[in-house]
């Protein structure tokens, strides 16, 4: 475990201050307090100026690097805060709140535009915000500000107002997901090797995000059947750039501008591919309780399988999953419309089905408007445009008392549709919405069953509710009925292109997602249900229902039993069955289980062992029977710093042997440096961490830790857009010769941003040294020793003794007091073997030690102990600043 003595030494002067005067406040006592410095038992004639401690709340004028806390919530970055003496009473000092700092408060627009400034517009003028209090807690290097909520924009836990959003830095991103599979048939048949992948490359320039998506597939098949007339080798390969696009955030409008190839994401109309542009209110910019629904994809894999999620032919997600039930919940709420799910089993079987992502009731806060404006040309796969120029718009207006009115229009020369709806926030009873959409379509008479035009209506009702008291949620429940002649834009385009009216004419759609946890009973229920009926073909029903029960069995705790029933239907073929699992703990981080899968003509049962090695690694082994044949399979997963790695292997007696490998990661490169890393959302938001060049520093975000590379850089990719994300150093796993004087950073990043945050980390050996000036004296008590990176590596104790961290052979350091570098020291090269035997270090005077004036607030505010000049007195700030 690393020694953190440096941290304790750094706060020593502030601990003395705290002991003498309590916390520093903007309200002070009138009388000064006198102290006897003899209690410090300093040797010789050492003097300490305790003037700054003799008045409660006094902070010596100068510059301080502090963490700013607004209403107990720290802002994302540290700030240089200047303190200056009061005009009427020099024993009091005041903080300068710069426009840059005040902009981070999230003040309401009418409040912010009426603020007045002093000191050449460098400091907030006093007395404007009644009830505002400022406290300096120097023991924690913090500036604590209390501000009435009435002045601030709407906030939510872990969500910041637009004033704190960070567009990040410019850079290059390249993310990928690669899946490789090999399969050998035991009794003839085909051996196959396949590699598939998809990813995103792009550039960030200021607020702009430019991206290109790609997908590829390589498949080699060799027949082992000599009697097969088609025996031999066959290779198929393809590479496609599937999409080119760009976007940027418009924070003042709480909207997003998107250009290029896109998929129409609408709360009212069905989606389709197009090339053009759009401006839309971005739900991600809204507080969490107002955001949309993120798709939840569930299914059951009979063996280790590759799951591919695509939309209109474009792969948007691909991963490997072990045998058993699975849920994919990290697609994000920007994915909408109809998704195609393909499950490729290791035994060669393929399951396919479609799901329609749900839309939450299109509600808006009273007095606000949510909107989308889009235009362009519809597009087929392969960047080919089809159809005429179209345009569309939709909006939701929060009227009052929980009511919202919404509607929209979409169309081109031959197709028009319009919608109107109303929504109601029922408070504790949830939210409900109802709308009707009318379509008018012109087609050639040959394609419309003898009709030149079609007119139809579609009716929809949706409901959403969180039952917090019951620990349950109806994520979505909805019903939609469409008349026979109603057409969506996508169906119109298909009909125009093929010269015939669609098949699979939608009639009714039911959809529901439900989740409930009965904590006292140890029971949880999950349900996902969709049912489609059509005017011209048979209905389709898909569902997945899971029931789990947790209980104790004697001395064995946390035993669980679960049952999953499922049905997935596609192209008149259905996969249905039941999956049963019983598991119990085996040691601290392991479980043993029995799993049975029954249905669809294939029954299997397995005994399994699951073990979590650490936060980043787990594996699973299964042995059992399938179709009366022995089966053995294994699955391994590791969330590494460079990539997420999944590996699987399967053996089925007399049938086949297979193996699979999945890699998901990326690379980020900026002017500040870059790193290879794992990734979750292709081309998405990330945070570049700089550990001052120190390698192997463990940094954690929302997932497993990543470690800095040889250049001291790492990328945390599991961050959320427009959320207050936090990354921190795991101090218990720091390298032996590393010290972290700052271990937590925060960032609220716009979509696709490359955030940049720097940790104060010192690397090197530790030493106990004695500093001596050229006249034989020593630097004063409390003097700071800094390296060439201006990192404080030690504080001078009595008689020139100092504990140094981050010591390196031949390194140059400077000693500061009164805010100025007075002398320099040079460490020997090589360093002596014993660094704790009072290493004597001469400190050479710099010669010019005059105080330095800060250009940022010149001339009214001076660095550290320099007093404000009498000829240019600052405007004093009242105690209620």
PLM segments and residue spans:
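Post-signal-peptide, soluble extracytosolic/periplasmic N-terminal scaffold domains
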Residues: 2-18, 28-291, 600-668, 678
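Short, ordered, surface-exposed loop/turn motifs in non-cytosolic proteins
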Residues: 60-69, 73-83, 693-703, 775-789
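A short, amphipathic beta-strand motif
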Residues: 68, 297-299, 687-691, 765-774
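Short, acidic Ser/Thr/Gly-rich low-complexity loop/linker segments typical of extracellular
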Residues: 80, 704-713, 790-801
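Short Pro-Gly-centered beta-turn/loop motif in secreted/extracellular proteins
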Residues: 88-97, 331-336, 712-739, 751, ...
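Conserved, compact domain cores that house catalytic/ligand-binding motifs in diverse enzymes
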Residues: 164-228, 369-444, 466, 472, ...
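Feature captures outer-membrane beta-barrel proteins of Gram-negative bacteria and organelles
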Residues: 165, 193-207, 234-251, 387-401, ...
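Transmembrane beta-barrel strands of outer-membrane/channel proteins
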Residues: 176-180, 212-216, 257-263, 373-377, ...
């Amino acid at each position: 475990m690393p020694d953190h003595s440096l941290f304790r030494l750094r706060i020593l002067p502030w601990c003395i201050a705290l002991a003498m005067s309590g916390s520093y406040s903007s309200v002070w006592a009138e009388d000064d307090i006198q102290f006897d410095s003899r209690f410090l038992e300093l040797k010789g004639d050492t003097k300490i100026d305790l003037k700054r401690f003799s008045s409660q709340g006094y902070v010596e004028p100068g510059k301080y690097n502090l963490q700013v806390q607004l209403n107990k919530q720290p802002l994302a970055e540290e700030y240089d805060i200047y303190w200056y003496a009061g005009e009427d009473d020099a024993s009091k000092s005041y903080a300068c709140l710069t426009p840059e700092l005040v902009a981070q408060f999230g003040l309401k627009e009418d409040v912010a535009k009426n603020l007045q400034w002093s000191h050449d517009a460098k400091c907030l003028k006093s007395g404007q915000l009644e009830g505002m209090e400022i406290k300096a807690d120097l023991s924690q290097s913090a500036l604590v500000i209390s501000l009435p909520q009435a002045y601030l924009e709407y906030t939510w836990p872990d969500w910041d107002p637009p004033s704190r959003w960070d567009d990040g830095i410019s850079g290059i991103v390249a993310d990928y997901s690669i899946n490789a599979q090999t399969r050998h048939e035991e009794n003839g048949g085909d051996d196959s090797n396949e590699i598939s992948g998809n990813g995103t490359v792009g550039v960030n320039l200021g607020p702009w995000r430019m991206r290109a998506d790609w997908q590829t597939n390589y498949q080699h098949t060799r027949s082992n059947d000599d009697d097969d007339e088609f025996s031999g080798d066959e290779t198929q390969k393809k590479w496609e750039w599937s999409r080119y696009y760009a976007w940027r955030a418009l924070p003042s409008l709480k909207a997003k501008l998107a250009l290029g190839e896109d998929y129409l994401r609408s709360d009212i109309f069905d989606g389709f591919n197009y090339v053009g542009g759009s401006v839309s209110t971005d739900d991600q910019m809204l507080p969490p309780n107002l955001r949309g629904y993120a798709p939840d994809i569930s299914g059951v894999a009979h063996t280790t399988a590759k799951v591919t999620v695509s939309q209109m032919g474009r792969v948007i997600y691909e991963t490997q999953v072990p045998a058993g039930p699975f849920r994919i919940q990290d697609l994000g709420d920007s994915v909408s419309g109809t998704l195609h799910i393909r499950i490729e089993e290791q035994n060669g079987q393929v399951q396919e089905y479609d799901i329609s992502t749900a839309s939450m009731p299109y509600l808006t806060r009273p007095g606000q408007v949510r909107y989308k404006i889009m235009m362009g040309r519809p597009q087929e796969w392969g960047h080919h445009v089809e159809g005429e120029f179209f345009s569309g718009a939709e909006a939701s207006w929060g009227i009052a008392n929980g009511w919202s009115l919404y509607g929209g229009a979409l169309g081109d020369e031959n197709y028009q549709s319009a919608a109107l709806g109303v929504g109601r926030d029922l408070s504790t009873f949830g939210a409900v919405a109802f709308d009707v959409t009318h379509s008018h379509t012109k087609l050639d008479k040959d394609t419309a069953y003898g009709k030149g035009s079609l007119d139809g209506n579609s009716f929809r009702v949706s409901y959403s509710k969180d039952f917090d008291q019951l620990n349950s949620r109806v994520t979505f429940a909805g019903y939609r009925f469409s008349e026979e002649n109603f057409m969506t834009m996508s169906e119109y385009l298909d009909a125009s292109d093929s010269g015939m009216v669609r098949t699979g004419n939608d009639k009714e759609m039911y959809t529901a997602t439900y989740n409930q946890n009965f904590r006292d009973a140890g029971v949880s229920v999950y349900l996902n249900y969709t049912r489609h009926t059509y005017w011209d073909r048979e209905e389709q029903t898909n569902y997945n229902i899971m029931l789990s029960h947790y209980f104790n069995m004697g001395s064995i705790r946390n035993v669980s039993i679960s049952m999953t029933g499922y049905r997935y239907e596609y192209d008149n073929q259905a996969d249905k069955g039941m999956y049963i699992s019983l598991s119990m703990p085996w040691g601290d981080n392991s479980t043993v289980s029995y799993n049975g899968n029954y249905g669809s003509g294939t029954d299997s049962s397995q005994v399994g062992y699951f073990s979590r090695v650490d936060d980043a690694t787990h594996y699973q082994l299964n042995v059992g029977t399938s179709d009366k044949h022995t089966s053995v399979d294994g699955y391994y997963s590791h969330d590494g710093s460079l990539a997420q790695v999944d590996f699987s292997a399967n053996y089925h007696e007399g049938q086949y042997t297979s193996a699979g490998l999945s890699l998901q990661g990326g690379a980020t490169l900026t002017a500040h440096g870059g790193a290879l890393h794992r990734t979750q959302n292709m081309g998405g938001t990330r945070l570049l961490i700089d550990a001052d060049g120190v390698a192997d520093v463990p940094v954690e975000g929302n997932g497993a830790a990543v470690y800095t590379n040889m250049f001291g850089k790492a990328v945390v990719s599991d961050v959320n857009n427009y959320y207050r994300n936090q990354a921190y150093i795991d101090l218990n796993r720091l390298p032996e010769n590393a010290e972290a004087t700052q271990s937590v950073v925060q960032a609220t990043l716009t979509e696709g941003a490359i955030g940049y945050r720097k940790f104060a980390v010192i690397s090197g050996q530790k030493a106990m040294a004695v500093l001596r000036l050229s006249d034989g004296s020593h630097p004063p008590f409390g003097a700071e020793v800094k390296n060439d990176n201006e990192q404080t590596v030690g504080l001078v104790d009595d008689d020139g003794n100092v504990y140094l961290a981050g010591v390196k052979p031949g390194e140059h350091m400077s000693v500061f007091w009164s805010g100025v570098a007075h002398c320099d020291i040079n460490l020997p090269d090589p360093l002596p073997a014993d660094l704790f035997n009072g290493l004597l270090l001469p400190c050479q005077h710099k010669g010019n030690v005059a105080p330095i004036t800060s250009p940022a607030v010149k001339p009214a505010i001076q660095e550290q102990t320099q007093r404000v000049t009498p000829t240019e007195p600052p405007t004093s700030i009242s105690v209620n600043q």
